[in-house]
Amino acid sequence: MPKPKLFLPVLVLAALLAFPVSAGATLSFTRNPFHPAVFAANDDGSGAHKIGNGRNPRVSPDGLSVAFLHEGAKNAQELQVVLAAGGPARTLLVGWRESFYLAWSPDSTTIAALKGPELGKRKLVLIDVLTGAQRVVAQGFFGGFSFSPNGSELVYSRAGSEKYPPRSDVFRVSTSGGKPVQLTRSHNALDPLWGPTNQIVFVKQIEGKKRKYGPKNELFLMNPQGKGVKRLTHTKVDPLLQGLFPTDWSANGSRLLAEFEGQDTSYAVTVNPKTGAQRPLLKAEESGFVGTALSADGKTVLGYEGGFDPGNKHNVASVPYGGGKPTVLAKNASEPSWSR
């Protein structure tokens, strides 16, 4: 595969990436879902400006860059990166798959993503944002991945086939190379999210034989060695619904944001990482508030109103973690991400 073209000189990019993080934070979101465009703004929604054509934006931790999905020639699914301030976008990956799975390293220098053909196995790759160099970490069928707090390791879930429910387990691997370490052997573990207090939250799909349409999701915790596995949540999940997926941790690990999903349903749920107590952030309904991120201080949830249906009216908003009235940050917008 040819190396991606660099539209900005490497030295300029290096200087930009070396800038100190500003006091403010960056917000990004999508407008016009049928001809999607990506915007960047301050974290209060001010100063919004278009930065590219595409969707599913993800702001880098330092707030300087935004990665997003761009549809290229012949419907090619491209991972592009652009400076939040604006400028030409760079294509880092062609054949990007499952664009809702993307992870920035904590230092904003590396992106983890999936690539492959439209059908079949995927490759989990680490991409150097500055050079575009790629390294394959694993192959298979993946259900989520995240970096360790210091960025030295990656945790991911992988199954050997597309069979549903997936026979998936969680693995840990060094970002500098080496053999992956298998952390679970239950064949029903997926979507690991590495937290800041030496624990990983992940999904176990359980009670598949008891339920009419397949298993439900519950959240579990374990340490980075795969030990101390503990069930965190006990959730009522109707037959056509799936249950909880982890979304984001607060910086001190005291608060956890999750999403309750299922047929025509997606809404934000707060979870106590110690007790497992859970509460819908707003209303538990089909067209509820979709949560996409939690601020580092754990006080504010970012998301959008109107549910997941692209035909609905959406507004990007923030909501206090304890609940309350949403503050609209961007009207007629969805899929928000921020560095706050």
Predicted features along the sequence, with ranges:
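Bacterial N-terminal signal peptides that target proteins for export
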Residues: 1-10
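Sequence signature of WD/YWTD-type beta-propeller architectures
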Residues: 21-340
